[in-house]
Amino acid sequence: MQTNLLKPKAINVEPLSAAKGAHRAKVTLEPFERGYGHTLGNALRRVLLSSMVGYAPTEVTIAGVLHEYSAIDGVQEDVVHVMLNLKGVVFRLHNRDEVTLVLRKEGEGPVKAGDIQTPHDVEIINPDHVITHLSQGGKLDMQIKVEKGRGYVPGTMRRFGDEPTKSIGRIVLDASFSPVRRVSYTVESARVEQRTDLDKLVMEIETNGAITPEEAIRASAKILVEQLAVFAQLEGQINDIFDAQPAQRSTQFDPILLRPVDELELTVRSANCLKAENIYYIGDLIQRTETELLKTPNLGRKSLNEIKEVLASRGLTLGGRLENWPPQGLDKR
């Protein structure tokens, strides 16, 4: 009886239409054992929404303004609305954790995120985002502190370093650092060979553009692995889980890769062509590319398509790479 749990073989990322500046994608992973779609989908969703690192404005100083309930001469919106609009600006910092930026604008018209003066290692993802509007003769002089953080941090929880008191005119903002806007998931049915009781996990992820959905799901998976690693070895250092016996870990292959290609039930012509190239196991086959197979004598496009279809039915594709293949003791006929 088969006791090994299935691992997802097919991963597909499909970009979806989204609001301007946002990134949205559908990520599909299959197959999972029954129930694992909900188990992993819910865990990934919670991590994506709560634990992604991002950048947000945290403090603002405006010339002539003492507090957030002030009005600014020549500015159509009050300070509260200006702060709300400022939170909609998406920043990305490279090789730094915080920066203070300057925004100076005069004259009638809209003030946009692109008007903020930025150094070379600070990027504004949505430069057309409107922060406020100036009337004729209006002027805005603002300093914006942008920091790196995680999740949501209310302004009441923020401190001012070693300063004994708050500086007059410095406005502290509630900071939403998360670059992930929305996450949803569904679990559909999947099939592998004769098994139809498997799960397919479909996740829709929307970000603000500071990171892509693919980067977000990779980061969330890494967080989960690091958090769960402690349960894999209840004694010793967490790093030992990843560092100990790397050779042993790397030789654990999915059992399907150790099966002979004869079990794929290919046509006699295709099977003979593979054996002529010393391809005896499914693990040998998936490491070949389409180009390499087409160079095989007597193996044409029709045979190649047959091989690809048979592999796809088992959740496999060509062009893979397996470290430490073949495993020790595997019979090369």
From Swiss-Prot:
**Which residues does the annotated region (Alpha C-terminal domain (alpha-CTD)) include?**
253-333
Q: What's the EC number here?
A: 2.7.7.6
GO cellular component entries = cytoplasm; DNA-directed RNA polymerase complex
- The enzyme's first-digit EC class, named in words, is transferase
> Which keywords does UniProt give here?
DNA-directed RNA polymerase, Nucleotidyltransferase, Transcription, Transferase
Q: Is the keyword Transferase assigned to this protein?
A: yes
Which superkingdom, per the lineage?
Answer: Bacteria
Reactions the enzyme catalyzes: RNA(n) + a ribonucleoside 5'-triphosphate = RNA(n+1) + diphosphate
Gene Ontology process terms (BP): DNA-templated transcription
Q: What does this protein do?
A: DNA-dependent RNA polymerase catalyzes the transcription of DNA into RNA using the four ribonucleoside triphosphates as substrates.
What's the family?
Answer: Belongs to the RNA polymerase alpha chain family.
Notes concerning its domains = The N-terminal domain is essential for RNAP assembly and basal transcription, whereas the C-terminal domain is involved in interaction with transcriptional regulators and with upstream promoter elements.
**Which protein, by its recorded name, is this?**
DNA-directed RNA polymerase subunit alpha
Which species is this UniProt entry from? Methylibium petroleiphilum (strain ATCC BAA-1232 / LMG 22953 / PM1)
